[in-house]
Amino acid sequence: MGTAQVLPGILQKHCCILPDRNTESQCTLCGEPEEEEGGDLAQPGLSFPGPAEEDIDQQYSWSPTQHFNEERYSPAPRNMKGLTGSRNQPQLCAGHTCGLSPPDDCEHPHDHMHHGSDVRQPYLLSPAESCPMDHHRCSPRSSVHSECMMMPVMLGDHVSSSTFPRMHYSSHYDTRDDCAMSHTSTKVNRIPANLLDQFEKQLPLHRDGFHTLQYQRASAATEQRNESPGRIRHLVHSVQKLFTKSHSLEGSSKSNINGTKSDSRVDDHHQSHLSKHSKRSKSKERKPESKHKSGMSSWWSSDDNLDSDSTYRTPSVAHRHHMDHIPHCYPEALQSPFGDLSLKTSKSNNDVKCSACEGLALTPDTRYMKRSSWSTLTVSQAKEAYRKSSLNLDKPLVHPEIKPSLRPCHYLQVPQDDWGAYPTGGKEEEIPCRRMRSGSYIKAMGDEESGESDSSPKTSPTVAIRPEPLLKPIIQRPLGDHQTQSYLQAATEVPVGHSLNPSINYNSPKFRSRNQSYMRAVSTLSQASCVSQMSEAEVNGQFESVCESVFSEVESQAMDALDLPGCFRTRSHSYLRAIQAGYSQDDECIPVMTSSNMTSTIRSTAAVSYTNYKKTPPPVPPRTTSKPLISVTAQSSTESTQDAYQDSRAQRMSPWPQDSRGGLYNSMDSLDSNKAMNLALETAAAQRHAADTQSSSTRSIDKAVLASKAEELLKSRCSSIGVQDSEFPDHQPYPRSDVETATDSDTESRGLREYHSVGVQVEDEKRHGRFKRSNSVTAAVQADLELEGFPGHVSMEDKGLQFGSSFQRHSEPSTPTQYGALRTVRTQGLFSYREDYRTQVDTSTLPPPDPWLEPSLDTVETGRMSPCRRDGSWFLKLLHTETKRMEGWCKEMEREAEENDLLEDILGKIRSAVGSAQLLMSQKFQQFYWLCQQNMDPSAMPRPTSQDLAGYWDMLQLSVEDVSMKFDELHQLKLNDWKIIESPERKEERKIPPPIPKKPPKGKFPITREKSLDLPDRQRQEARRRLMAAKRAASFRQNSATERADSIEIYIPEAQTRL
């Protein structure tokens, strides 16, 4: 049967039949006659513009009744093997049970059912037996078709059973339109028994619990939601929270599902999507075509490939596609009239024309509306929006009852594309969503989206190119695009261009993805307020239009300019989400980000708006994400860096505005570095591409988009174009990208390293050096950069160090060599200026050089207690303070010796103390000084660790203590007017030691004499003993292993000799 014929017929038949069928399908599923309800619904549904039943019947040359044994089908309402049978049974049974004439009402459903029940083993979802092959043949469209064909079966099933019967009429029409095309195109798709079982398992639940729900899409979601409106809302909110995750998940789940159901399709789709970027374009074309095919799978319009991806993705996706496409067909039609109207109304009332009519006429729009709608309507607000739009548009179409029922549906099903699709797609996906929702979202985004969406070969290359999350967002974004008329127009226009230009297409969807994420965030927020949701939808649409146009241009340019492989995956949605979550989370960066956002119209809208939105719902972990996503967005690398150093930069925020990073590090510099970034992106893309050609191409395109966006944003003010590599953690040639660099001072940023900004400078080595230093140097560099006010270049370098090459990435050529040179200079400069800094800090952080022992001890303790890292710079500060103290003591004692006529004994003591101090300073202090320098120099091969420094410092403390004791003694003598005998402490000490001995009288005099004579010497000896003991202990510890080895070496030869 011609698609043209079958689709209208199917649409008509479904539109007319499904309402009736829906009326009774619920009966079959729930045992409750839905006839009245269905009838009511059907009546409004019938009121929806749609092909006449006669046409449907006529066009359904393959009347479901022909293929479907009504009794057979109805007897197997729960026959899970023929999911169609099971689901369709309820539907058909419902139809029949409802008393709907099987030929008219249930024929098509029966046909579906018939395929489902008769062909349960093959589980043909579509009326035509040949559809399975077609479904597979048309993997991209097939996916749509299969979805649609699934939709007819499942559509009928869901429509009659789970889906809200009331909603099915209009949906039926739209769905019919979609389904007709879907049926015709998709013909019959064989759904694996397991998939059918899943469908049955899900759908019956949906039927049971959610039979009133109008959306097939919600059927799976409904299945989840059917339990209670509260749970549904919870799921909806979870889905909203997870929508980004869901995108990532969906990419992965779809990939898995694709592997399951349509692994062949996956291949086909990979090929189709890879070879069919034209088909991706056709996805765009399908947006028009799909106005029928994708119309039925409106939700899938831009993602017909997604549909195919989703379809090939699998049982779960097949479920989702069945369910989705059923929702797509019916619910889509439903949602086109209902969801779309609602959604379109919610997102853009302009788009909301008559979704029922648009569902037929504007199937792509319906798609868009639906996606955008679901985006808008994803939550209870979706209900709200649905109520609004549905009430506005669907009032004639839907009875208030239906609308309330739909409200209970929550339109979780509305986002069935993504969310509904996930729930519908299978709980498998929901679980991943939950997993992503669980908090590994960043990783899920990075790994799942990049790994699963991008990396998983199951996802079609198109999916890879347009990551499933992207695809989903794209799918939804076209819908989201249609969410807002402007974006719909932009999507219609830009997607057409994109369809013409796959790169642009991907870029646009990427943009769409980001916008979709944004829209989702908006829709989430919108869920917070349907009104704001609608305004946001409009804003989103406009924003997306602008962004789409800008980014499509920029991305296409970036694609060309960057010469990036295939698709740089813009995880723009997740990336923006993360980044903007980062900004929003890091309000410090937000000003900069805001400026970047402001500067970047696109990003400013996305980032600013998204930041605003995302501030509330950012699924991305707060700073962690912001740091890693850091450079990529409008954030300047400084921002990323700032994210990394947000705390310190919070203080330095004003001193370190993005542009104030120094003339060196202007966003314009980063623009120049954009060239470097382009090179880096190209290199990274090439590397990633080499690492994962497909994923890397996808990422490349996405990143090309990001790169172009970043360039634009950089121009706007994004200094750092770090294209977030987080998507491709495994593909990241430099596992620790600039983001890490930016964050290397932050340990948590290390965790964030998944998010790699493809910075101008991609430097693992540098990062390592930076990171190593940044830990110790970060504080110093931060303080130094701020406090020392070293040349912006040096500061830049340090910050580059600290912040990773983020600064340098843009301010400096991305060449690692340069960075290394800078780092080297930095290291030297750091140390030197650190010395200066130490001098400054010495007074602040360390006790003023007090010539006496207690201050010295305090200083030591201060060093230990100091919150500062005990790294080379810290120890240098301590050393500097100690040196100054000793020098002070020496000068004081020398002055005293000159000014006062002192006894030779006292002068000897002074000379001894001063000589000891000078010797200590000239030798051990100098050694320690160089050790600290080496510690601060990441390039130092025998680079001592902080522990080494601490150990050496402890050793020095023995000597310092010894010297300090000498000066303390001199100080006591000075207090005693340089009279040794007169020192009361000595007398007391003389007396005090005697009690210690058990024989005080005997020991008294000798001890007294000894102390009076040898007190200074004894103190020195004691100090020496302690020092020697400490040295011995240290040397023993250090050499214990060696000593053991020596002993072994010694004894082994002996043993050998003996042997």
Swiss-Prot record:
Keyword GTP-binding in annotation: no
Composition bias type Polar residues, residue spans: 245-261, 632-645
Phosphoserine carried by residues: 302, 308, 390, 456, 667, 670, 673, 720, 745, 776, 811, 983, 1012
InterPro entries assigned: SAPAP
UniProt key word Membrane: yes
Major localization listed first in the record, in broad terms: membrane
PTM-bearing positions, type Phosphothreonine: 743
Tissues/organs with expression: Expressed in various brain areas.
Disulfide linkage: none
Top-level taxon of the source organism: Eukaryota
Bias (Basic and acidic residues): 262-271, 747-756, 1007-1025
Membrane topology: Peripheral membrane protein
Name assigned to this protein: Disks large-associated protein 2
Oligomer status and interactors: Interacts with DLG4/PSD-95.
Family statement: Belongs to the SAPAP family.
Known role: May play a role in the molecular organization of synapses and neuronal cell signaling. Could be an adapter protein linking ion channel to the subsynaptic cytoskeleton. May induce enrichment of PSD-95/SAP90 at the plasma membrane.
Gene Ontology terms describing biological process: modulation of chemical synaptic transmission; signaling
A Pfam family of this chain: GKAP
Biased composition annotated in UniProt, kind: Basic residues: 272-285
Subcellular location(s) of the protein: Cell membrane; Postsynaptic density; Synapse
Keywords: Cell membrane, Membrane, Phosphoprotein, Synapse
Organism field: Mus musculus
UniProt region (Disordered), positions on chain: 31-54, 245-311, 613-669, 723-756, 985-1025
GO CC field: glutamatergic synapse; plasma membrane; postsynaptic density, intracellular component
